[in-house]
Amino acid sequence: MHSVSDTRSRGLLKEHLRPFGNVIDVEPKVALKAAVEYLVRAQEQHADAGMGSYHLVHGWGASYPETTGYAIPSLLASAKFLEWPMLEEPAIKAAEWLLKIQQPDGGWQGGRVGEGRPSIVFNTAQVIRGMLAVHAHTSDERFLIAARKAALWIASAQDPDGAWRACNFLGVARVYDTYVDAPLLRVHAITGDALLKEAAERNLQWVLTQQQANGWFANCDNTVRHNDRPITHTIAYTIDGLLECDHLLERPELVSAAAKASRELLQQFLPNGTLHGRYNAQWIGSEYPLMTGCAQLAITWSTLFQRTGEEPFRDGAIKMTEALKTVQHASLVGPLEQRGAMPGSYPLWGRYEKFAFPNWATKYFIDALLAVERIKK
């Protein structure tokens, strides 16, 4: 644990005075290796094989099942890209732990371990991503069985209009559950359970009713208080889910909806080199940029370039990833624990995950690096 007044922390805070987008050239594989090492370090802090996150004042937090789950595919993809098979071990260890803590109803708990929370739809869907990745890697049926049980529970918890409320975070319907739909469709593709595809399609129909003419989505924030100006993290979840579902269903209206929202953010980013952390219904921004949302948008812009062929999406993805590599580079002067990590906000004292290095921000930075490598000329 460190104080924000110690020498290393002061040096890190000084680095965060630089404008976002002040690019320093960093080799992609160097950035990727450092980011992956942070996730492995996060796992090594606890006996349970889950991943927590580092906070500049409070130190390491407890393991987070949801984010551990969707970090697994990132570790396995990095192992392949870096030709570093040792990364397979922490991915499989994490999956084995998640098997042990699956709830009797089939879900996984919300929040961090030790908080005693019930199964939550969104969190459970992200663990399914990890289960499916390890099943594909090992052919161990236990992981597919767990994924199917979880997916069936999610489908059973759905409301008639296609949204999820009672078994979801805050008990309210949210459009970023498109990021739930895709894991359901992936399980369906393997098992053939028709009700999983039906549940995903019902939710997608509901989500499309929440989009305004200018591309902005209502009911998109992970709070009630600020639902009129959602964070880029949940906006990007929504977009990414739409694109992933289109890949699985081949429904052009999903790409159109994703592209409409994405172009609004891209048009703000390309001339300015930065984004705000929140956007209201007129796409007017507020708060410091969220590194998680920025990384996720780099991923979705990469995907949209591949789907549409529109060059600005490629330009935005590359430019954003270069800026994120520079933010990561600043971690070299800070405490050893956070080396290679992506902060919650830039600067570190932004409102979202203040002074913290959430493992999910680093997970999406890894995914962004890999996505951009696929679209470079």
Where are these regions (language model features)?
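Glycan-recognition and catalytic cores of secretory/periplasmic carbohydrate-active enzymes
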Residues: 1-377
